């Protein structure tokens, strides 16, 4: 998915609004994913997956940090996310569909917390951005 200059600008502005809440929103998106798509829990057998778990919060922060890195390097996401792509493809062997599920849950989380800012244009640009991130993360599977 190719992000237009407008999409990139919208994504950067939206992510600035997320700001210091990024880790919390990442954890909430993970919780939503685990509740809505229980099979995703199989990738985290060692985690306490209960609401507010320190492990889920910690992983939510990792997700948010990776997305922040992708936003900062939106013009070269393949390089910026290369190590993460290797990890998910070769060590963790995460089914690629799970990136789409988490992307959806993150969009829902952002819409809940930023309703005024989550316009149709922002939704569309963030959706394209998340699809691009998912594509990069699954690129090493081939």
From Swiss-Prot:
Residues 2-142 form the Globin domain. GO terms for biological process: hydrogen peroxide catabolic process. It comes from the Eukaryota. GO terms for molecular function: haptoglobin binding; heme binding; iron ion binding; organic acid binding; oxygen binding; oxygen carrier activity; peroxidase activity. CDD domains: Hb-alpha-like. The keyword DNA repair does not apply. Pfam families: Globin. O2 binds at residue 59. Heme b binds at residue 88. Keywords: Heme, Iron, Metal-binding, Oxygen transport, Transport. Red blood cells. The keyword Aminoacyl-tRNA synthetase does not apply. One of its GO terms (cellular component) is haptoglobin-hemoglobin complex. Belongs to the globin family. Heterotetramer of two alpha chains and two beta chains. Involved in oxygen transport from the lung to the various peripheral tissues. This is Hemoglobin subunit alpha-A. The gene is HBAA.
């Amino acid at each position: 998915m190719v992000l237009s200059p407008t999409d990139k600008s919208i994504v950067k502005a939206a992510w600035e609004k997320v700001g210091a809440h990024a880790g919390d929103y990442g954890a909430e998106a993970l919780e939503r994913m685990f509740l809505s798509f229980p099979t995703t829990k199989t990738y985290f057998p060692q985690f306490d997956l209960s609401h507010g778990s320190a492990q889920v919060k910690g992983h939510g922060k990792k997700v948010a940090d990776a997305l922040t890195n992708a936003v900062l390097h939106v013009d070269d996401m393949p390089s910026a996310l290369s190590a993460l792509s290797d990890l998910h493809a070769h060590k963790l062997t995460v089914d690629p569909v799970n990136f789409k599920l988490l992307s959806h849950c993150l969009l829902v989380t952002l819409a809940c917390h930023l309703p005024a800012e989550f316009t149709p244009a922002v939704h569309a640009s963030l959706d394209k951005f998340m699809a691009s991130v998912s594509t990069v993360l699954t690129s090493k599977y081939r």
